[in-house]
């Protein structure tokens, strides 16, 4: 048996373990509470393992800017003008070498609690992924936990220079930062930054807009953006060296992989330099790139640097439009063809912390309509798949938590708890006692689907064969609302069918002769197909010259194990 297909469970610990149901909009940690690393218990992790997951990606683990006062623990006070929400953005890192204190039961022992969590994760048979945020840091970055003899970012910068390859930041000499318009509290002291630094989303202005990443500052990797984009990589820039040390530090703590935030905003040359060095010392460690520019995909995969890339602008965007009825299901084929032979290197998902929940009013408006997209996402290839916590329960993301507002997303900026996840948590029991029948059924569907993808060798490691081209003229198949394909090895074949229609359908599927020879079944004539997802369905018998007749539920699908007789 080959290595398992990767299934990643993405979760924000601050919300995952929080059982406080106060949920006061813009509430403090004292009012609304916070989940802790200890809530990622052996029971919870074993539940994930049984549900088919191989990895857990914890976001918000590293210390990030927050309005909560931890000065009594020696942690510097943050300034509210440069923080989004009370809890702050997990992507505005204030100390690359520290654990976020919100997640600790004993703040003074927060690193010990993280290391114990890593140990629990590994004992459960799962692997840990954390965020590596290389492009920007919190505006008031100040590492109090950096190792001895490690200089802090910016501590040796020549701030009179707008650009220097030896600086860690970009500066706007003679200009003071102005972000006061974004803060509506009563703080009497204005945040001072002089000279102003460039903002994280490449905004070289002393007065960033509310739409900019104003809570962050851009890191300098030796590219002079205001000087025509000239690159100064020899000698190796100081920022490169600091970032390599940070990656090695967290790898030494037992981290099994890094999801690299906004990787395309950092020079490709840096990744080509740093990843081989980390992998040499920690073989098998994963690097996943958040990337939205398809023209850069292959350069990020060259020389086995990044292991996987986000497939947001390809498969995710197409599946969302197909599920909503904006595009025909046949466009899924074009999404796959657009990445060609690197499709197995793409990380598939239908939810994450940046995107709107499937069941939200901004997407499908119902938890009952997500199965078709998830079947395609999970079964289309050997590549990894990610599930966002609460997705498997049909979480709608329609709370108005505070900074985020009601936008169809689960907040990453506020202290909050998620109703569906909180009831599943059930004070650490992680059971179905407080879940509705629909929530249980959806959770069971996810578990069955993920486990099938690793149990069936055809889905785990098999080749892909698109059946859409053979069914465009098939009057018994709607190529605008159904999608069908084969996955197979020399020993096993699976037929996967998804129905994006709001109605149950009876369809026929034509399988061309070429497909049988493609899977070395040219000597077989008669076949049976056993349904794997829906146990109440009967097996189907067919011959090579026949169309296969199937009944597929609305907004769902089926996986059939095909055997030759």
Q: Model features per residue range: what roles?
A:
Residues 19-38, 362-367, 538-549:
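Short, polar loop/linker segments at the starts of domains and inter-domain junctions
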Residues 502-565:
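C-terminal beta-sandwich/jelly-roll accessory domains of carbohydrate-active enzymes
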Residues 113, 270-271, 507-509:
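Residues at alpha-helix caps and immediate loop-helix transition turns in enzyme cores, especially N-
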Residues 3-4, 92-93, 101-118, 143-257, ...:
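Alpha-amylase-like alpha-glycosidases and glucanotransferases acting on alpha-linked glucans and related
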Residues 66, 81-82, 340, 352, ...:
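Loop/helix patches that line or flank the sugar-binding groove of alpha-linked glycan CAZymes
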Residues 13-15, 62, 100-103, 134-136, ...:
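Short, flexible loop/turn elements at secondary-structure junctions
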Residues 1-127, 135-138, 142-153, 157-163, ...:
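N-terminal structural segment of carbohydrate-active enzymes
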Residues 12-15, 57-66, 131-141, 261-267, ...:
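Short, solvent-exposed turn/loop segments enriched in Gly/Ser/Thr/Pro and often Arg
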């Amino acid at each position: 048996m080959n290595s398992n297909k990767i299934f990643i469970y993405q979760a924000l610990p601050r919300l995952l373990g929080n059982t406080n149901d106060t949920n006061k909009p813009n509430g403090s940690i004292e009012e609304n509470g916070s989940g802790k690393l200890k809530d990622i218990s052996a029971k919870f992790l074993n539940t994930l393992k049984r549900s088919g997951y191989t990895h857990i990606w914890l976001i918000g683990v590293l210390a990030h800017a927050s309005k909560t006062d931890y000065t009594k623990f020696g942690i510097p006070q943050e300034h509210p003008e440069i923080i989004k929400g009370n809890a702050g953005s997990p992507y505005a890192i204030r100390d690359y070498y520290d654990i976020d204190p919100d997640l600790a039961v004993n703040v003074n022992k927060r690193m010990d609690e993280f290391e114990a969590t890593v140990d629990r994760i590994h004992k459960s048979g799962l692997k840990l992924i954390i965020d590596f945020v290389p492009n920007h840091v919190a505006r008031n970055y100040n590492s109090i936990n950096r190792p001895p003899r490690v200089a802090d970012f910016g501590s040796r910068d020549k701030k009179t220079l707008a650009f220097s390859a030896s600086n860690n930041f970009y500066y706007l000499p003679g200009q003071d930062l102005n972000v006061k318009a974004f803060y509506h509290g009563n703080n009497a002291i204005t945040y001072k930054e002089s000279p102003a630094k460039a903002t994280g989303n490449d905004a070289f202005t002393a007065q960033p807009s509310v739409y900019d990443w104003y809570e962050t500052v851009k890191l300098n990797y030796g590219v002079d953006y205001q000087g025509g984009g000239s690159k100064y990589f020899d000698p190796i820039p100081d920022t490169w060296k600091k970032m390599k040390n940070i990656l090695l530090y967290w790898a030494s703590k037992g981290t099994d992989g890094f999801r690299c935030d906004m990787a395309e905003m950092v020079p490709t040359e840096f990744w080509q330099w740093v990843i081989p060095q980390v992998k040499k010392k920690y073989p098998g460690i994963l690097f996943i790139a958040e990337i939205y520019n398809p023209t850069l995909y292959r350069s990020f995969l060259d020389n086995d640097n990044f292991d996987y890339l986000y497939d947001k602008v390809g498969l995710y965007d197409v599946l969302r439009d197909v599920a909503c009825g904006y595009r025909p299901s046949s466009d899924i084929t074009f999404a796959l063809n657009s990445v060609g032979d690197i499709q197995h290197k793409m990380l598939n998902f239908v939810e994450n912390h940046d995107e709107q929940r499937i069941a939200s009013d901004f997407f499908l408006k119902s938890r009952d309509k997500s199965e078709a997209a998830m079947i395609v996402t999970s079964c289309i290839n050997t590549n990894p798949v990610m599930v966002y916590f609460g997705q498997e329960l049909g979480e709608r993301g329609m709370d108005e938590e505070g900074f985020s507002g009601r936008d169809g997303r689960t907040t990453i900026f506020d202290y909050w708890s998620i109703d569906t996840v909180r009831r599943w948590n059930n004070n650490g029991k992680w059971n179905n006692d407080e879940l509705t029948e629909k929530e249980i059924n959806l959770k069971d569907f996810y578990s069955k689907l993920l486990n099938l993808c690793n149990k069936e060798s055809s889905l785990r490691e098999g080749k892909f064969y698109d059946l859409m081209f053979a069914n465009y003229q098939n009057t018994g198949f709607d190529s605008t609302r159904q999608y069908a394909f084969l996955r197979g090895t020399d020993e096993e074949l699976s037929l996967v069918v998804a129905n994006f229609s709001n109605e149950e359908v009876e369809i026929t599927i034509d399988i061309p002769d070429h497909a049988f020879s493609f899977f070395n079944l040219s000597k077989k004539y008669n076949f049976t197909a056993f349904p794997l997802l829906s146990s109440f369905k009967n097996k189907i018998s067919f011959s090579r010259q026949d169309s296969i007749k199937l009944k597929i539920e609305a907004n769902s699908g089926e996986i059939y194990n095909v055997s030759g007789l």
